[in-house]
């Protein structure tokens, strides 16, 4: 099925699902400036969509550029070129993006697009580098890319690259989207950011522990996020995902989530999606492999 953005002649159409950071602890800062963290990722059955077709001339053409993002620095283009370099292929690609996820939202839009590009073109180009190598390429593009390449809910450590698969409940989430772009660099550079949270064991986390250490910083610096949290907390325990700006609450069923969504003002866009331990992208690739 194609969207208005992706033409019917695209050879391969794949989802690029959103993710939530159900918690995020900052343990410290490394000498290179990166932060040691612990976080829990789960995917959503909602996201962007990408279409791909093979080119014989080696060119990478993204036909749906994003306003304000130069072609050469777009993560989709960078992922495609990194895969070309790593595999030695002479093939290129036409790529179309149906952008549904907000930028600067903390739900992984750009990282997910990059991972879908790596996996999609690895399939179309028959480069077959394997998940480990693709995750390695992805890490050079961004700390969140490997979790999308792996496609499994995970407890992440290090800078986010050390992944332990976990089995979580798959509740329904209401994700609200405050209309502000949150700078990840600003949040992680904030003097007031907690950077000394003690490490937590994954079993303790799954028993209900954890918080988001970035949330107090974002609430202080971005009143749009603070006000959205105050509003959503009237209905459900709400939390920031990643560095935001998106916030979320969980529900046992879709009806309950939809009821709250209908009570939010039009100035606070939102969507309802179910948590997934296996990403939509991997479900689609598994289905293709069976054909």
UniProtKB/Swiss-Prot annotation:
* Span of the signal peptide: none
Binding-site residues for ATP, renumbered to this chain: 102-112
Q: In which pathway does it act?
A: Isoprenoid biosynthesis; isopentenyl diphosphate biosynthesis via DXP pathway; isopentenyl diphosphate from 1-deoxy-D-xylulose 5-phosphate: step 3/6
| InterPro entries, A to Z | GHMP_kinase_C_dom, GHMP_kinase_C_sf, GHMP_kinase_N_dom, IspE, Ribosomal_Su5_D2-typ_SF, Ribsml_uS5_D2-typ_fold_subgr
Q: Which key words tag this protein in UniProt? A: ATP-binding, Isoprene biosynthesis, Kinase, Nucleotide-binding, Transferase
Q: What is its EC number?
A: 2.7.1.148
Transmembrane stretches in the record are: none
- State any single GO MF term: ATP binding
Annotated active site: 19, 144
Q: Which family does it belong to?
A: Belongs to the GHMP kinase family. IspE subfamily.
Q: Which PANTHER family match?
A: 4-DIPHOSPHOCYTIDYL-2-C-METHYL-D-ERYTHRITOL KINASE, CHLOROPLASTIC
The record's section on HAMAP family has: IspE
Protein name listed in UniProt: 4-diphosphocytidyl-2-C-methyl-D-erythritol kinase
- The organism encoding this protein is Ectopseudomonas mendocina (strain ymp)
């Amino acid at each position: 099925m194609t969207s208005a953005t992706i033409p019917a002649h695209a050879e391969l159409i794949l989802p690029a699902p959103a993710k939530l950071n159900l918690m995020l602890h900052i343990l410290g800062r490394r000498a290179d400036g990166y932060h040691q963290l612990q976080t829990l990722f789960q995917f959503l059955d909602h996201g962007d969509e990408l279409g791909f077709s093979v080119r014989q001339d080696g060119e990478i053409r993204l036909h749906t550029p994003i306003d304000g993002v130069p072609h050469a620095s777009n993560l989709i283009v960078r992922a495609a070129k990194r895969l070309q370099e790593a595999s030695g292929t002479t093939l290129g690609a036409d790529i179309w993006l149906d952008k549904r996820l907000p930028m600067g939202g903390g739900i992984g839009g750009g990282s997910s697009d990059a991972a879908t590009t790596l996996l999609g073109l690895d399939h179309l180009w028959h480069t077959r580098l394997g998940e480990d190598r693709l995750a390695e390429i992805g890490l050079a593009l961004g700390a969140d890319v490997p979790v999308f390449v792996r496609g499994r809910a995970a407890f992440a450590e290090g800078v986010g690259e050390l992944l332990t698969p976990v089995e979580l409940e798959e509740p329904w989430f209401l994700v609200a989207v405050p209309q502000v772009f949150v700078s990840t660099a600003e949040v992680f550079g904030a003097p007031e950011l907690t950077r000394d949270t003690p490490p937590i064991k994954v079993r303790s986390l799954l028993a209900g522990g954890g918080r988001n250490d970035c949330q107090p910083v974002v609430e202080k610096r971005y009143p749009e996020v603070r006000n959205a949290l105050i509003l959503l907390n009237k209905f459900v325990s709400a939390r920031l995902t990643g560095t935001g700006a998106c916030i979320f609450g969980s529900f046992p069923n879709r009806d309950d989530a939809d009821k709250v969504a209908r009570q939010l003002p039009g100035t606070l866009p939102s969507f309802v999606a179910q948590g997934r331990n296996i990403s939509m992208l991997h479900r689609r690739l598994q289905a293709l492999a069976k054909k």
